[in-house]
Amino acid sequence: MDLNAIIEKMETGDQDAALTALQTYNKEKSQCFSFTSGEEEDRERLGELVLSFLERDLQPSCQLACLETIRILSRDKKSLSPFATRHAMQILIRHAGLGQGEGVTPEIPDLEVIVEALKCLCNIVFNSEAAQEAAADLQLMVGLAERLKQCREPQWNHDVRFFDLRLTFLITALRVDVRAQLAHELRGVSLLSEALDATFGLCWPDMYEVARAGFDGCSELPPLGRQETERVMEILKILFNVTFDSNRRHVDEEEAATYRHLGAILRHCIMSSAEGEERTEEMHSHTVNLLGNLPLPCLDVLLMPKVQQGSIEYMGVNMDAVKVLVEFMEKRLDRGNKLKETLLPSLNLLTESARIHRETRKFLRNKVLPPLRDVKNRPEVGNALRNKLVRLMTHIDTDVKHCAAEFLFVLCKESVSRFIKYTGYGNAAGLLAARGLMRGGRDPGHYSEDEDSDTEEYREAKPHINPVTGRVEEEQPNPMEGMTDEQKEYEAMKLVNMFDKLSREQVIQPMKIGADGKMTSMEPHELHHLASQQFGESNNSDSDSDTN
C-alpha cells in the first residue's frame, strides 16, 4: 500500500481503518531495513500519527499494529525525530510496562504489546542520542530494574525478559550516568547476579559453591537451553558494563562478598555448556571478559569448590575452572584471528590469577613451562603451548606480544634468568627492556621460593646453549681467523661506519643499556668509542693468551 494512502487512513482517526492499513504496511515492510530516500517526511508524518493513536484507548490488536509500525520506522536513522522526543519515549515506556507512577499496570499484562514496545525502545535508544538522554531523564533504568527483580516470577515470558535485558545492555553501554545508576543506586551487581542465578536454576551447597538444582553431584551437566543461554549472555554483557572499573579500585568487605558471590556463578558459567559449540564458546567468551573485571582477590572463588571424583586436583585445590580457562585460551590462540580482541581477555585473566594465587601459578607453570628437555630447537619452534606463546612475543601487535611475554614472565616468578631460559634472550629482550631488567635480576614480587628443577638433558646442554636463541647451536667457524690486527680493525671500523650511516639516515637507532637497566639511545661518538674499546680489549686478550 502507498505510504500516502496509509497516512490518509490514519488521519481519519478511525481505529478499524487504521488497523487494516497498518497491518498491510507492516506485512509489506517486515523485512525492510533500508528505506527509499525522499520519503523521510512521509515516514515522519506516519510516525507522528501512530504515536498520537497510542495515546488513545485502543484495542490490543491496534496497539500492537501501531508498535510494529514504529519498530519498522525506527530502523531508519533519518526518520527518528518523532520517536526521540521525551513525550514519545514516555508513551513507549508506558506501553512497555516500565513507567514510573503513570497509571496502574494491568493485572494480566499484554505480553505481545510489551515485547513490541521493548523492541521499539531498543531500536530508538540504539540509533538516537536524544532518545538516550530522554530515557535517562525518564528513569527508564529504574523501571527496568524493578522488572529485573521479578526474575523468578512466572508471568514474564522469555521475550519480555530478553528484551528487558537487551534494552538494559544498550542504555548502560551508551550512557555512563545510567551505568553508574545501575551499579550503585540500584545495586546492579547483586540484582544481575540474582538474575543469573534464576536463569541457571542454581542451588548453593556452600557459601561460594554453586550447583545446578536437580543436578548436584553430577559429573556432567546437560547443556543450557537456547533461551536461557541468550538471557545469560545478555546479563553477562550488562555486568561487564557496570563492573568496568571494579578491578582498578579498592572494594570494601561488603562489595568483595558481592563480587565473590558473582565469581562463584561465573565459575559455573565457565564449567557449563550451551546447545552447540559456537554458543558455548560465545557464552564462555562473555564470562571470561567479565571475570577480568572482578577485583583480583575475589578470583579465589575459582579455586574454592571441593575436589570431587573426576576433578583436576593440584596441591589439594580444585583446578577444573583453571583448566577450562587454559583450554579456552589455547583454542583462541590456535585460531589466530583478531588476537587482541579474542585472546587477550583470557591471557590477562590467567596472568593476574597466576600473579596473585600461588596454586594457580604452579598449576599453569606445570602446563605451560614443564621442565625443559628440548634444547635443540628454538623456544618458538614447535606445537607445545610454550612454543605458541613464545612466538607471540614477537607479534606485530604490541599489546599481544606484551601480554604473552607478561604471562610467561609471571610463570617464571619474574626471574630474568628463568625467563631467558624458557624463551631465549632475543625473544625476552622486549619485555626486559620495558621493565629496566636488561642487566638481569628480578622484578620485586610476592612469590614463594620454590625450586626450578632442571632436567638431566638441560643440565648437560646448559654450557652450550646460546642465550640469545635459547638452544644449543652448532659451533661456527671464527670469521676473523687468520686476519691481521690491521684487518680486524679495518672490518670493525667499516661495521661502525655502516651503523653510523644507518643511524644518521634514521633507518636504525643504536641503543645501550643505561644505569637503570633500561634502553637508551647511543650517540655516534659513543658508537665509535665502544668499537675502539672492544677492539682494544680483544687485542689485549689475544696478547695475554700468547704470553707464556
Curated annotation (Swiss-Prot):
Transmembrane segments: none annotated. Residues 443-484, 517-548 are annotated as: Disordered. Disulfide bonds: none annotated. GO terms for cellular component: cell cortex; cytoplasm; plasma membrane. It is found in: Cytoplasm, Cell cortex; Cytoplasm. One of its GO terms (biological process) is G protein-coupled receptor signaling pathway. Its main location: cytoplasm. The keyword Iron does not apply. It comes from the Eukaryota. GO terms for molecular function: G-protein alpha-subunit binding; guanyl-nucleotide exchange factor activity; protein folding chaperone. Keywords: Chaperone, Cytoplasm, Guanine-nucleotide releasing factor. Chaperone that specifically binds and folds nascent G alpha proteins prior to G protein heterotrimer formation, promoting their stability and activity: folds GNAI1, GNAO1, GNA13 and GNAQ. Does not fold G(s) G-alpha proteins GNAS nor GNAL. Also acts as a guanine nucleotide exchange factor (GEF) for G alpha proteins by stimulating exchange of bound GDP for free GTP. Belongs to the synembryn family. This is Chaperone Ric-8A. The lineage of its organism: Eukaryota, Metazoa, Chordata, Craniata, Vertebrata. The gene is ric8a.
